[in-house]
Amino acid sequence: MADKGKGRDVGDAPRSSDALPWVEKYRPATLDEVLSHQHITSTLERFIDAHQLPHLLFYGPPGTGKTSTIMALAARLYGKSYRSHVLELNASDDRGIDVVRGQIKAFASTRNMFSTQTDTFKLVILDEADAMTQAAQAALRRVMEQYTRNVRFCIICNYVNKIIPAIQSRCTRFRFSPLDAEQVA
């Protein structure tokens, strides 16, 4: 797996806390630690418990917990096998059609040989997906359709109107509102 995207590698040995950026050091590691947006985390918990996780679209202003929430969900789903089940990409860096046709399709087209009942699908996390080109989003839609049995996608963006309707319609959408002052303190 390419080591791209945000966040710590949940399945790896912990790094020295002095070397971690502040945002990584204090990022919630579990859904219980995500204190804001309880309605979203409780819905995600129900999806996990029912083994029925859909494609997800998280949108809202920066700093509202979108990335932290999906990383905590992935940690709950996969634990130590996180790295073999999750592909994290920052779409503002990898925004073109070649990434969709190359990295994402290659990851989506393979299955894990030793998967259990609870982790039969992989997860692709596309952060800042509103930076993807229209052509890349159209290619992503086709990959989502073709590999939906094997992979779930979490599309994260600040501006949902920059995500093509064909992708929006294939995802369960969650709006992350700005945090209250007492939630930040």
What function would you assign to each model-found segment?
Residues 1-173, 177-183:
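P-loop/Walker A NTP-binding region and its immediately flanking N-terminal helices
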